[in-house]
Structures are given as structure tokens and as C-alpha cells.
Amino acid sequence: MVLTDDELKYIEEVLGRKPNELELGMMDVMFSEHCSYKSSKPILRNFPTDGPDVILGPGDDAGIVSLTDEYALAIGMESHNHPSAVEPYGGAGTGIGGIVRDIISMGAKPVVLLDALRFGHMSNQRSKYIFDYVVKGISDYGNRIGVPTVGGEIEFDDNFQYNPMVNVVCAGLVKKDEIVYGSAPIVGDVYLLMGGTTGRDGIHGVTFASEELTSNSEVEDRPAVQVADPFTKKRVMEATYELLETLDIHGVKDLGGGGLTCCLSEMADKGGNGSLIDLNKIPLREENMTPYEIMLSESQERMVFAIDSSDVEKAFEICKKHDLAHAIIGNIIDKREFIIKDDEEEICHAPNILFTEAPIIEREAKEPEKIIEDVEIPEVDVEEALYKLLSSENITSKEWVYSQYDHEVQLRTIVKPGDDAAVIKVDDETSFTIGTDCNSTHVLLNPYDGAASAVLESINNAISMGARPIALVDCLNFGNPEKPEVFWQFKEAVSGMSDVAGKFNTPFISGNVSFYNETEGVTVNPSPIVGTVGVVENTKIKTMTLKDDGDVILVVGNTYPELDGSQYYKHIHNVVQGYPPKIRLEENYNVSTTIEKLIPKYNDNITSVHDISKGGLIIALALMSIKSKKGVNVNISNIPSTTELSQDDKLYSESNSRFIITVKEDALTTIEEALSKNNVAYSVIGSVCSDGFKISNDNDVLVDCSVEKITKENTTTIEKQMA
């Protein structure tokens, strides 16, 4: 039980009595950090949530943003970290299942999945096992329900050895006049429970997710992990679409964390009403289940609909057609109370407030002591460092992962995995871009700048595809919030994210907080994962693929001596300390928005775009060459900067808001004038060629190799480890 003594006292004061066993279990679930956001809610209020394209912000199963006159996008992001640590295949699969149901609940048809993952190093057998089976769980579930998994990102670090991060995004298209919400607004309506039956799996799933893991969690907490059932999910999806098309559905919500307790209490309370539930009507999978088990079960593939009683017969016909369990389990009442009956006996009778408004906890925040050692960074051969970086776990190609995903089902995927973001077709004129980002090492070193940079990087990835960024989603993964140092990280991260999102007018429309990502004193690197939705005309889509020999290569944006936290320091010199790249908000905004405006204006003359991030300029250039199977001839002597740079700074710095763009040679003057007019620093550094990857600094040739060589270094690491 996660209820504190103060919370128990509060419950008794509101009830005027002690809660019975069922009520106590239900409130324990709803007071959990996972359901109540009792630690994070005051901090999350700093996020901007309104914008010109926002239809629905945070608070429902998903956020909704406008894409075209006809279509909107429902999008959500969730974590399934604890379950995936205990049972990686099932934990990852049910994570996908839950976020897909969230999108269906809004009336939308899921068209895309992404995953943002964190693991320990593959040299550790347990981390390797978790990595393998998380990917299999995501792949099997997504492929079987026919929703493409089109992207995401992965990091490997020792701090994720015991606590992997499994964050999943789903987005779906919905016509604006067909949106439904997770509320029960009409007194007298009945609750239709449809889908899978209710069993004993997943009981205490949310309280399990609101505590630290231990060395015994793999055995002790396995029953708290839900059982995935993608085949039932497919039928649930089809039945839901038919119910929404056939009946006047007043509200829909999926049964995720907290099961029936969470679903019914939230639906009724959002509608300003209450619920009267008949426990005996709930379809069960197992015999002799107690009321406690029934109300706390998190069995998968279940949905609740608020419908008019006159539509029950039609609803039942649809459920039977799809061979799904179904029942009317109660009705909506005009008192804001949650009442459950077992036969004629009332076994729960409490006000909604005890399920939907847990008291806020004011957590202490304390900046941890920062220790920086004097470390000598020896000079290394640039070409050898390039090969090591390209083959390092965090930069190597993730094709082994995304090749297991069906990313072309539904035939909407225009730009496939491996670019700055995925591009998904809406109609003949419009597409949307979607991607996720976070550099967990940068957030560890400075949560404000690191988290702000995650938002900026995600926005820049959308811009690199030619899109206009319109909205953000997030999943905030941190350690134990009861520890002041962890809560300080959380507050600083949210502050940085809010500042960047506000500046770019890209509101957060949906998100999730995952605390207690710790195991016996080992805390994960703080990981606020950010996803950005962008809108792009189909004729204006850009990619990082180099196009024609002779195209001119420009670096746009200033580089600073910012190597702390870089992949170069981490993987070449085994150094992780100091201060990560800073946010220079006005400068970053000017560079990014200038590129955003130039791409559609000079669409035919700008031939490729890629933002510079992990690994710095040299890695960005290498990945463009690998992607396109074309070469580059570049000199880094005059890359833009406001300060003196070392050779390492020029090659490996991970400063924010920098882009590589290639332009047609006869358009160079026009592009240069446009950049200068907007006071954006840039430099012409070279040109595209048919083969050869050559990097020079003044007269010194630093790298001179074939594209085939760098491709080989970049594409075999995971395959070798997982063989």
C-alpha cells in the first residue's frame, strides 16, 4: 500500500468513517503517483498547453491538434518502465496496447507508433535480454494490430541496467466532427463494458509503478504485469469503430492503469456526475474473484462506453459480431459519488473527490553537489575516433530494431525510420511529422539546459523535415521524488522545457510522469522524452539524404566550445561530467525559425536538411553520407562561432540549433542573402560528391575514407551484439 498516514487521515475525514477493504484498495490505487500526479501536478502547471492548433490539451486519454480543415490528430505518450523491467516482452506489449486504446478512446484511428527506449549496455547479459525482448514485444504487438512503428530513439547507459525506459507514442487521425471524450456527461446513460474479460492480472499495477524496484521485483512483482492480447485488441479496435459509427456515443474511455476504478471514477467526475455499478454484471475470466480483485484488475483490451439505454440492443449486436465479452455494468447518477453494489449490498460508497483529487504533496527540492574533476583530454586520431563513434551504441544504426517493425502497413509512411523524423500522409496535400528526442546525459549534467535542449532538438527535427512544429507530447522519467535531489532535477527540467515550448508557441497537449525509476539506490539518468508534431505540405518535405554532386554544403548556426556530455567525451575519453550545451533561447529561436521559413520559400533550391546533435558536426555529415550513399568534401576551418574553437570543438561540439543544409550551386547567393538578412550565422564548408568522405581543417586532412567504410562501421554493432 502506498497511502501515507496523512492520506489515510484525510480519507477518514472526508468519509466520516474508516474505509472498508475495497474502498481502501481503490483509493490506494487512485492516490498512487501514477494516477494522481500528487507530486508533479503543481510543477506541470508551468507547461504551456494552449495554442492556435490545439483542440484538446492535457487531461483526457490523449491530446488533439488540428492538421487540416477536416482532420485532427489525437496523440498520447505513456511509459511502461516498471513492467518492462520485470517482464520485458509483456511489459512492452501492454505498453503499446494501452497507448493504442487511449487513441481509440478519442474516436481516432491509430496510424503511427513510436518508441523511446533506454537500456543498460549490451555487454551486460541482463540488459541484452531486456533489450531483445522489449523490441520483440513492441514488434509483435504493433505488427499484429496493423499499426506501423515508424521511429523513436534509443540510448544505452549503465544507469538503465536495472531500470529500462520503455516510452511509447501513438497518434491517430480523426475527423473533427467525430471526436469523442473520456467523460460521462448525461445522467441516466448506462456504462457498456466491452472487450476482454476481467482476470487477476495487473492487480496493483499502478502502485507497483509508484514504488522503487528491488532485486526481488522480477519474481515478486510479476503478477502486477498485465497480459498482452493483440488479437483481442484487433477485434476491440474494429468493434469500437463500428460502435462509434453506428451509435451516438456520449463518452469512451479505455481501462488502463487502475482498471475499472480509475476509468469509471474519471469518466463520471469529468462529466460532473457519479456512478452506480453492479459488480455482478462484470464479465470475469476467473472464478471466485473478490470485489477487490475485480475493481483493481488491469486486465487488458477493455473499454467502457457511456451510451443511451435505448442503444443497448444495437451495442450488444456489434459486440457479439466481433466475439467480444460485453455487459451493461451500471449507470450514471446525478450525485458526484462512486457507488458499487454486490447483489443488493453497497460495498463502496464514497464521493468522487476521494478518487480523482488526491491531496497535493509539496516536495522538497535541493540541488545536488556537483563535482568536476580535472581531466586531461589527450589528442586522438580523428579518423579512428570517427569509426569508434559511428560504431558506439548510442550512434550506431538502429536498423536491427526498426527492421523488426512493420513501418509501412496502412501505406501512409512517406519518410521511413532513420531520418530526423517520420512523415505520415494525411491526404493528398498534407502530411504530419513525428519524432522523439532526449539526451539523458545532458539532462543528468544540467536538467534545465538538458531538458530544454530535448524540446529544442525535437522541434528542430520537425523543422528539418520541412514541417511547421505545432504541438508537443512528453514522458518525464525520473527517480524517487521523495529525494530532494531528484525532485530538483524534475523541477528544473520542467522549467527548461516550458521556456522553450513557450518561445516556439508549441504547447504540450499530452504527457506522462514516471517516477520511482530506481533500484536499490541506483537512479536512472533523468529522461524527459519529448515528441513533436509538425505539419508539412507534401511537396515541401525534406530529408537528410544528399542529392546531387556539386550541391553546396552549409553549416547554419554558431558552434560553441561545448564538449561536456558529448558522445566524443563519453565514448572516446570515458568522461561524463561538467556542463552540457546551453540554451541560448533568442539565438536558438532565430536560427530554427529562419530555417523553418527558408525551406518552403526556397523549396527547389534547398536539397537536404539535417540538424546537428549527438556526435557533433562530423557525425551529422557521416550519417548524411551513409543515408544517401554519397560523399562529401568539407573543410571545417571557418565554421561559424562567436568564440575561438579548438579542432575538437569544431568536430564534436553538440551546441544547439545548428543545421547542415545543402543547396544548388546556382542558388547559393540567394540562400546566403536570406540567412544574412535574418542575422543567422552560417558558413559554406564544402560540397557533395559521388563518393569519398573527406574532412579537412585548413590544410590538414583529418579524414579521407570511402562512404562504404563509414557505412560498415555504423551498421554492424547491434547485429554483432545480438547475434
UniProtKB/Swiss-Prot annotation:
ATP binds at Y37, D474, G511. Substrate binds at S79, H80, N81, H82, R101, Q226, E298, S299, Q300, S514. GO terms for molecular function: ATP binding; magnesium ion binding; phosphoribosylformylglycinamidine synthase activity. Mg(2+) 1 binds at E78, N512. Belongs to the FGAMS family. It is an enzyme of class 6 (ligase). It comes from Methanosphaera stadtmanae (strain ATCC 43021 / DSM 3091 / JCM 11832 / MCB-3). Mg(2+) 2 binds at D102, D254. Keywords: ATP-binding, Cytoplasm, Ligase, Magnesium, Metal-binding, Nucleotide-binding, Purine biosynthesis. Signal peptide: none annotated. This is Phosphoribosylformylglycinamidine synthase subunit PurL. It is found in: Cytoplasm. Part of the phosphoribosylformylglycinamidine synthase complex involved in the purines biosynthetic pathway. Catalyzes the ATP-dependent conversion of formylglycinamide ribonucleotide (FGAR) and glutamine to yield formylglycinamidine ribonucleotide (FGAM) and glutamate. The FGAM synthase complex is composed of three subunits. PurQ produces an ammonia molecule by converting glutamine to glutamate. PurL transfers the ammonia molecule to FGAR to form FGAM in an ATP-dependent manner. Its EC number is 6.3.5.3. It catalyses: N(2)-formyl-N(1)-(5-phospho-beta-D-ribosyl)glycinamide + L-glutamine + ATP + H2O = 2-formamido-N(1)-(5-O-phospho-beta-D-ribosyl)acetamidine + L-glutamate + ADP + phosphate + H(+).
